[in-house]
């Protein structure tokens, strides 16, 4: 074991990147790097990047600039870039940023210790090659366990859908599913370390196992994971609406450990726009899935994604998106102005929507979503909810956790409750959380 040094990882983008950052920390621990939340203390800084939108990509270059002068005042300091921008740019990043030491793509996490050792010797390296599926299967690093009540578990990587606006297949590669036995073993190991809730991760979890002969379907995997003794809750993300199967919907009715929340990105409420996006479903088909999920799990909470200003989007198309939102009543929504990405099919479509109109549509959509989110939060006030207590809140004098429907609840209670299921009465709503009081008498919680 070498002398301890400090690692700071800054994460951009999706939950898959959050999970990858946890794996980065685990891989580098054996190289003598301990995690720190302070970049000024770090001997190695890694930016784990996102390239889904141009704005996210530009932000990376801005953050790299912050570290330009660090080496002159800190001997041995190293700077690295991983994730989707690294996969997309590769060697060009080293050429554009002379003070950058190492670059590693989405298929190269397993090489990170070797790349860091090379950087410590003064060798600048970029490793962004895709690797074959058989090799990838054997190189899925598990997320390390350092306490915590919840944990991400990767079940698959990549995407074969090629939505016309999306760069993910080009930077994450084609779909590949982990062996179900490996996933279940990782869940069992996590529970033995004190984990009570797992979130199953993939770019399109609904495709899990479909291309692997003899493997479980995603619904079958959920049912097997639910059999793990000591596990309280199961979540998953992200789902492609076209691949939501009747078997998966049945899990919401028949598997009590599966939480009553689903992230179901619609992207648009207009059939014309959905067709140009190559989403593979219609508005009516999406709503059929929503209603089937509601029938299976009354009270299920929906979150999603919406894109405004896609090339050719008319005001009528936009109003179709607004009306879809009003039908679904999302608990929360990630919404963005369309951003053309290199290599994607939509990048070649002539953009007919002005920047001013795109911003106007985004503002109107987000105003509506904030109203619906507030209404949803208010509906919880006065109810009793079961909360998986995850830890001490940012305020320090309260605990926090999540209800089945994925809303954060803060409440005053003894820290001995961390890691348990607590019954809480919701007393107040806020924009991004709920406030509650611990229940001392017996009663029915949702």
Curated annotation (Swiss-Prot):
Its EC number is 2.8.4.3. It catalyses: N(6)-dimethylallyladenosine(37) in tRNA + (sulfur carrier)-SH + AH2 + 2 S-adenosyl-L-methionine = 2-methylsulfanyl-N(6)-dimethylallyladenosine(37) in tRNA + (sulfur carrier)-H + 5'-deoxyadenosine + L-methionine + A + S-adenosyl-L-homocysteine + 2 H(+). [4Fe-4S] cluster 2 binds at residues 159, 163, 166. [4Fe-4S] cluster 1 binds at residues 14, 50, 84. Residues 145-375 form the Radical SAM core domain. PROSITE patterns: MTTASE_N (PS51449), MTTASE_RADICAL (PS01278), RADICAL_SAM (PS51918), TRAM (PS50926). InterPro entries: Elp3/MiaA/NifB-like_rSAM, Methylthiotransferase, Methylthiotransferase_CS, Methylthiotransferase_N, Methylthiotransferase_N_sf, MiaB_methiolase, rSAM, rSAM_horseshoe. One of its GO terms (cellular component) is cytosol. Keywords: 4Fe-4S, Cytoplasm, Iron, Iron-sulfur, Metal-binding, S-adenosyl-L-methionine, Transferase, tRNA processing. GO terms for biological process: tRNA methylthiolation. Binds 2 [4Fe-4S] clusters. One cluster is coordinated with 3 cysteines and an exchangeable S-adenosyl-L-methionine. Its main location: cytoplasm. Gene3D superfamilies: Methylthiotransferase, N-terminal domain, tm_1862 like domain. It comes from the Bacteria. Residues 5-121 form the MTTase N-terminal domain. One of its GO terms (molecular function) is 4 iron, 4 sulfur cluster binding. Residues 378-440 form the TRAM domain. Its cofactor is [4Fe-4S] cluster. Monomer. Belongs to the methylthiotransferase family. MiaB subfamily. Catalyzes the methylthiolation of N6-(dimethylallyl)adenosine (i(6)A), leading to the formation of 2-methylthio-N6-(dimethylallyl)adenosine (ms(2)i(6)A) at position 37 in tRNAs that read codons beginning with uridine. This is tRNA-2-methylthio-N(6)-dimethylallyladenosine synthase. It comes from Geobacter sulfurreducens (strain ATCC 51573 / DSM 12127 / PCA). The lineage of its organism: Bacteria, Pseudomonadati, Thermodesulfobacteriota, Desulfuromonadia, Geobacterales.
């Amino acid at each position: 074991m070498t002398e301890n040094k400090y690692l700071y990882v800054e994460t951009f983008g999706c939950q898959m990147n959050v999970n990858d950052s946890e794996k980065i920390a685990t891989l580098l621990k054996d190289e003598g790097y301990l995690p720190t939340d302070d970049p000024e203390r770090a001997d190695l800084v890694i930016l784990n990047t996102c390239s889904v939108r141009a704005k996210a990509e530009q932000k990376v270059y801005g953050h790299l600039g912050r570290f330009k002068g660090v080496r002159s005042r800190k001997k041995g300091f190293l700077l690295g870039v991983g994730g989707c921008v690294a996969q997309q740019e590769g060697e060009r990043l080293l050429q554009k940023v002379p003070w950058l030491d190492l670059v590693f793509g989405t298929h190269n996490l397993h090489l990170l210790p070797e790349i860091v050792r090379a950087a410590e010797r003064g060798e600048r390296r970029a490793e962004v090659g895709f690797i074959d599926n058989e090799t990838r299967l054997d190189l899925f690093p598990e997320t390390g366990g350092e306490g915590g009540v919840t944990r991400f578990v990767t079940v698959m990587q990549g995407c074969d859908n090629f939505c016309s606006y999306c760069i993910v297949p080009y930077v994450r590669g084609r779909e590949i599913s982990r062996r179900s036995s490996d996933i279940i073993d990782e869940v069992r190991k996590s529970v033995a370390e004190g984990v009570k809730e797992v979130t199953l991760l993939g770019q399109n979890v609904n495709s899990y196992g479909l291309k692997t002969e003899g493997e479980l379907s995603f619904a079958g995997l959920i049912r097997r994971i639910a059999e793990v003794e000591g596990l309280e809750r199961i979540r998953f993300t992200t789902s492609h609406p076209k691949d939501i199967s009747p078997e998966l919907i049945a899990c919401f009715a028949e598997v009590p450990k599966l939480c009553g929340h689903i992230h179901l990105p619609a992207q648009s409420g207009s059939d014309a726009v959905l067709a140009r996006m190559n989403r593979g479903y219609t508005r009516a088909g999406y709503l059929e899935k929503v209603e089937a999920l509601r029938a299976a799990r009354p009270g299920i909470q929906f979150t999603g994604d919406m894109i405004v200003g896609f090339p050719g989007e008319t005001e009528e198309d936009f109003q179709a998106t607004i009306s879809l939102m009003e039908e679904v009543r999302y608990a929360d929504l990630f919404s963005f102005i369309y951003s053309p990405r290199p290599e994607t099919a939509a990048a070649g479509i002539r953009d007919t929507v002005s920047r001013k109109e795109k911003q106007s549509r985004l503002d109107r959509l987000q105003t509506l979503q904030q109203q619906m989110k507030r209404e949803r939060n208010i509906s919880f006030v006065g109810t009793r909810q079961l909360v998986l207590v995850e830890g001490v809140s940012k305020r320090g004098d309260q605990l926090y956790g999540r209800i089945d429907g994925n809303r954060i609840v803060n409440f005053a209670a003894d820290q001995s409750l961390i890691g348990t299921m607590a019954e809480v009465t919701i007393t107040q709503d806020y924009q991004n959380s709920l406030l509650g009081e611990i229940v001392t008498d017996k009663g029915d919680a949702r």
